[in-house]
């Protein structure tokens, strides 16, 4: 399978069904069109839910989203076809709607909503593990972005870009990997764990078998950052200004060979990706032997 995204990769390999569950309206951020273009068969959104379950402009709460998804996933599992499902939660995003049972005067609103979101995930996993399909399913948890904690430590705060990535399921041995990674690595890692053949047509890595990255880079609007274990390089494409920091203290430093190496690393990956997209090299086309 030629794959740049898990929905297309898994679907082409074994005729799987791909689903996306979101709390809000499907047109938000053009998600409906984007996800369907990228291989999702079914989209579940605010349009599918009872109006009385909508709690704010971000739609329904996390616990309802998980409860809604469970019977849908069960139905697909009972059909005998494997599925790939993504659930996008939103409760940990202001404005916070905190259920009464999680109101705790000793905690800040941010802490209360995190406790609620964590409980929703925990309850979902407990219920999913009781399902027949839950015993042979890989669960992946990742944040789309972090949250600014305290004062900004640099132009692209570490706390806003350092997010959890957890793979969970039967047969997965407990382990903590201290290595650089990015969301682009999730699809290759899942396909590797499932032993689904694929042609790599993006710059992601299989975190369990490929050589670890020497560094990582990330962007926000017109700002680019790259870092390794000792140095952080930041570039503002709008102003042309460069910033260098020594790690782990994130202390301002002078440009060095290490920062120049990080700059080349980030720019080469960005330019390569742009070239691949512009020349149709990331298009998914199943191999002739795909079922």
Model-inferred region functions:
Residues 1-291:
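Solvent-exposed soluble domains appended to multi-pass membrane proteins
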